[in-house]
Amino acid sequence: MFIDTAKIFVKSGDGGHGSVSFRREKYVPLGGPDGGDGGKGGDVTFVVDPGMTTLLDFKYKRKFVAGRGQDGQGSKCYGRDGENLTIKVPMGTIIRDVETNKVMADLSHRDDTYTICRGGKGGKGNCKFCTPTRQAPTFAEPGMPGEERWVALELKLLADVGLLGFPNVGKSTLLSVVTKAKPKIANYHFTTLKPNLGVVAVPGIEPFVMADVPGIIEGASEGVGLGLDFLRHIERTRLLIHVVDISGVEGRDAVEDFKRINEELKNYSVKLWDRPQIVVANKCDMLFDEEIFENFKAEVNKMGFDKVFKMSAATSQGVEEVIKEAARMLKDIPVTDLEIPEDERFIPEDKKFTYTINPIEEDGLKVYVVEGSFVDRLLLAVNVNDPDSLRYFHKVLNNKGIFHELREMGIEDGDMVRLNDFEFEYLL
């Protein structure tokens, strides 16, 4: 079974909690705080596995969670870091954020890796909050939660040459003749419903990978049929072999077919349309008027395509010439990397010290709403029921300039300050 898309949930490990502990040992008066820090949560990383060819593994398992950091303990014992999680994917996998549909990573090379979720930071133990004026802190920092998100995996085949054309023109037959691939071959449309790969290894030429993509129909660039799925698989190919049925047995016009397929390519991607093409007039063994091929060749030449060959995949006539020309052209064509437009790239949220303050009116009261990633992280580290922890919270707000900014905005005695679900009254 060929699976080329998957949707999975990934989550890095939560950080371990810091410990609240005091040294209690005989003959050691005033031992002081000795709570250790929690361990960091495990990361989630995608790595390329050259041995994988589909995303079938993700059909049965869709939830991936890294290990949690161990909590800190007394005697300044630090918690162990959570176990990292490695997810193997085939070469050519694109990772998209489901929420934004933006591309997070393109894993198209053998050694590519991408860390998608960083583990949560371990919380500090109470010994880290000891100061000359706070000699016995009764609070510690909880571990930060790990990152989590749904991602879509999309496999774009890595092949040197892509076979292009309408259904039932002989692409699968050509692939079976020049490689050891065994695609399904029959005399009806859409015999091929999934891409097939094969290695062309002919004496005297450099081996290359050929992909037989299911037949493209008119409107494929707009998603008609499975058009977008099929077109996606030829985006990475360096060279296209455009196969047409020159025999006219099915009543098709080879020139019109050629124009329509190229129009679909252009509508889907101009860069794909500009890719070098070898034009192959297949089923020439069923052609009884040589002038039909010559007229076809002349029309294709007018469109700017000069590599036109006559071939019969069924009898192997002309196949060797096509393969040798493809091998020769590949020597001069660089490897194609998928270019991702700027507006489709995923930009991670800035996790540095950021916040906003917005004044609002509620029931006649002035409320200053403080929001941002800094606020979320700070509140996780505060125990509002512990006086020492609240004093630490007040000190952080003061040191970060939030109280100063509130005064600049005109806050008055008795106004409310809201940080997420936590509110307090401002007193001058």
From Swiss-Prot:
GO terms for molecular function: GTP binding; GTPase activity; magnesium ion binding. It is found in: Cytoplasm. Its EC number is 3.6.5.-. Residues 1-158 form the Obg domain. CDD domains: Obg. Gene3D superfamilies: GTP-binding protein OBG, C-terminal domain, GTP1/OBG domain, P-loop containing nucleotide triphosphate hydrolases. Mg(2+) binds at S172, T192. InterPro entries: G_OBG, GTP-bd, GTP-bd_Obg/CgtA, GTP-bd_prot_GTP1/OBG_C_sf, GTP1-OBG_CS, GTP1_OBG_dom, GTP1_OBG_dom_sf, OBG_GTPase. GO terms for biological process: ribosome biogenesis. Monomer. Belongs to the TRAFAC class OBG-HflX-like GTPase superfamily. OBG GTPase family. PANTHER family: DEVELOPMENTALLY REGULATED GTP-BINDING PROTEIN-RELATED (PTHR11702), MITOCHONDRIAL RIBOSOME-ASSOCIATED GTPASE 2 (PTHR11702:SF31). This is GTPase Obg. It comes from Clostridium perfringens (strain 13 / Type A).
